[in-house]
UniProtKB/Swiss-Prot annotation:
Cofactor: Mg(2+)
EC number: 6.2.1.1
Enzyme class of the recorded protein, top EC level: ligase
Keywords carried by this UniProt record: Acetylation, ATP-binding, Ligase, Magnesium, Metal-binding, Nucleotide-binding
Listed name of the protein: Acetyl-coenzyme A synthetase
InterPro entries: Ac_CoA_lig, ACAS_N, AMP-bd_C, AMP-bd_C_sf, AMP-binding_CS, AMP-dep_synth/lig_dom, ANL_N_sf
Tree of life domain: Bacteria
Positions that bind Mg(2+): V537, H539, I542
Lineage: Bacteria, Pseudomonadati, Pseudomonadota, Gammaproteobacteria, Alteromonadales
Residue sites binding CoA per the record: R191, G192, G193, R194, T311, N335, S523, R584
Molecular functions (GO terms): acetate-CoA ligase activity; AMP binding; ATP binding; metal ion binding
Length: 649
């Protein structure tokens, strides 16, 4: 193997895991040489109401992009995640809930989950929700979020979850785009000792133009905090559930019926509604969960992601429950009230598989041994990382400290658009290299291409693409198939472009090098630079703005904003604070710029295009390697920006 630090699979791990290296290689080869035969067999991981006869039907051709899997089969997601486990696992815990503070927790068995999901599905029906209708969720990390998701799938409604940290404007935009019929929320959320005004944000969102598609708001009383109540529109979760039966027949859904919409940031500013469908998504969620985490009966699994992100959808709810696992849902943050909180939760619930983000790992690493103080973490056997590439130093710390030098780390690479993990080690099959996502999952055909789209062989670096479809792939952008083709299939013809750069080493391992488009990855969450820029320029004192990503030791990427003020306006500490607060209000705390650089002008080409490449170099202090600047309309602007950057840093 090449020179990086290697962690080989131990004999014991290989012996006790679901797959060895030889089995992986054999199955992987089968999955790409005959995808229909491979997935035709693997699709049986689910229960089908009407078995499929067709497996794969996909095309990445320009103007004809179409993705279908198991298209003549019928199934129900909630039945696969709950009902089929009732006979053998009715009394097993399905959802373990841990509150923001250690004095709040709850255990929900599969039997209890079935009852709650059926009741809430009947509530949705009584509110006029039908198959294909969109339901918007803006929820805290409580079991009710999973109940609401599963209730939607039971009756064939399409859920659209908005992350609980997003602003009223962001909620409204997603409601309008999806024509949501109902909003499900809570009075307030709790996170890291703070209270999040969920209901108040929904109330404000529903004052915006175009949100009159919403007929009712169902409110779960989470904190008991006082909220505004709109008579005739707002309904109390507990009261409406009490009137409903705890039986609800699951709707038979076609494999290609929509399952959920999840909005993700694009480089053009308007969020994109990624659409996943029922059959292929759930097959892929179930398969990847089982093999990537080497899931075995009795495991207690904890994915720390919020359900507002794709990781929470696939690996907190659908993947684990489809496998009949026990999934821990956590309301808090890994370092509150003390840096040892994550390790304490592991010990309290005997967590055996832990899936978290490099941001959390780096934040804990900064606290050193405080992160593990008073804990033993002896229940852990598998660690996972998700959201962004993990730097080798953080990987080693995670392995040595949290995992006690005995738990393999699955460093998973995937996206909202991919539905599930595409590149990852498999615990008993893959020798590990800190910082590498290693090898593709079954059926996944990655390639590295140069800027012309030429496929590079062997050791190479360039743009990461996928050459063929896999069952969990998104099908389209909601109500915008043209934008879907334009965004993902126009850069490199006949290939799915991930937007990420990667290199492949001499062992065929993939190393993700980060975004190659105008999308930031802040704390593992994607945000379009254009989205933040449009929030900035909507401030009455700002004329122009350009946003770039800069390295950040905790968040991975920080947000560096160049801001040009209107004539007659001048920088001040007060305005600095006001502008940061403005962005928080417009988008959410996660989009708050780390640095504002007051700029008299921005570097532009003669055609008026802002040269972000140059702004990135200046922001990261690489002003001695700006590259070709011959197309600049006014080179003196660059000199001024470099001078200002040096003065402030």
């Amino acid at each position: 193997m090449s020179e990086e630090h290697i962690y080989p699979v131990t004999d014991n791990l290989a012996k006790n895991s679901l797959l060895t290296n030889e089995e992986y290689l054999t199955q992987y080869q089968a999955s790409i040489s005959d995808p229909s035969a491979f997935w035709g067999e693997k699709g049986k991981i689910l229960d089908w109401i009407k078995p499929y006869t067709k497996v794969k039907n996909s095309s990445f051709d320009s103007g004809h992009v179409s993705i279908k899997w198991f298209e003549d089969g019928k199934l129900n997601v909630s039945a696969n995640c709950i009902d089929r486990h009732l006979a053998t696992k009715g009394d097993q815990v399905a959802i373990l809930w841990e509150g923001d503070t250690a004095d709040k927790d709850e255990k929900i068995t599969y039997k209890q989950l079935h009852q709650r999901v059926c009741q809430f599905a009947n509530v949705l029906k009584s509110q006029g929700v039908r198959k294909g209708d969109v339901v918007c969720l803006y929820m805290p990390m409580t079991p009710e979020a999973a109940v609401a998701m599963l209730a939607c799938t039971r009756i064939g409604a399409v859920h659209s979850i908005v992350f609980g940290g997003f602003s009223p404007d962001a909620i409204a935009g997603r409601i309008v785009d999806s024509s949501a019929k109902i909003v499900i929320t809570a009075d307030e959320g709790r996170r890291g000792g703070r209270v999040v005004p969920l209901k108040a944000n929904v109330d404000e969102a529903l004052t915006k133009d175009g949100t009159d598609c919403v007929k009712s708001v169902i409110v779960f009383k989470n904190t008991g905090g006082e909220v505004n109540w709109v008579v005739g529109r707002d309904l109390d979760w507990e009261s409406v559930c009490a009137d409903e039966s705890s039986e609800c027949e699951p709707e038979a859904m076609n494999a290609e019926d929509p399952l959920f919409i999840l909005y993700t940031s694009g480089s053009t500013g308007t969020p994109k509604g990624v659409l996943h469908t029922t059959g292929g998504y759930l097959v892929y969620a179930a398969m990847t969960f089982k093999y990537v985490f080497d899931y075995q009966e009795g495991d207690i699994y904890w994915c720390t992601a919020d359900v507002g992100w794709i990781t929470g959808h696939t690996y907190s709810v659908y993947g684990p429950l489809a496998n009949g696992a026990t999934s821990l849902i956590f309301e808090g943050v890994p370092n509150y009230p003390t840096p040892a909180r994550m390790s304490e939760v592991v010990d309290k619930h005997k967590v055996s598989i832990l899936y978290t983000a490099p941001t959390a790992i780096r934040a804990l690493m900064a606290k050193g041994d405080q992160a593990i103080e008073g804990t033993h973490r002896s229940s852990l056997r598998i660690l996972g990382s998700v959201g962004e590439p993990i730097n080798p130093e953080a990987w080693e710390w995670y392995y040595n400290k949290i995992g006690d030098e005995r738990c393999p780390i699955v460093d998973t690479w995937w996206q909202t658009e991919t539905g599930g993990i595409l590149i990852s080690p498999l615990p008993g099959a893959t020798d590990l290299k800190p910082g590498s996502a290693t090898r593709p999952f079954f059926g996944v055909q990655p390639a590295i291409v140069d800027s012309e789209g030429v496929v590079l062989e062997g050791e190479a670096a360039g743009n990461l693409v996928m050459l063929d479809s896999w069952p969990g792939q998104m099908r389209t952008l909601y109500n915008n198939h043209d934008r879907f083709e334009q965004t993902y299939f126009s850069t490199f013809k006949g290939m799915y472009f991930t937007g990420d750069g990667a290199r492949r080493d001499s062992d065929g391992y993939y190393w993700i090098t980060g975004r190659v488009d105008d999308v930031l990855n802040v704390s593992g969450h994607r945000m379009g630079t254009a989205e933040i820029e449009s929030a900035l320029v909507s401030h009455p004192k700002i004329a122009e703005a350009a946003v770039v990503g800069v390295p950040h030791e905790i968040k991975g990427q920080g947000i560096y904003a160049y801001v040009t003020l209107n004539e007659g306006e001048y920088p001040s500490p007060e305005l600095y604070a006001e502008v940061k607060q403005w962005v928080r209000k417009e988008i959410g705390a996660i989009a708050t710029p780390d640095i504002l650089h007051w700029a008299e002008g921005l570097p532009k080409t003669r055609s008026g295009k802002i040269m972000r490449r140059i702004l990135r170099k200046i922001a990261t202090g690489e002003s001695d390697s700006l590259g070709d600047i011959s197309t600049l309309a006014d080179p003196s602007v660059v000199e001024q920006l470099i001078k200002e950057n040096r003065e402030t840093s």
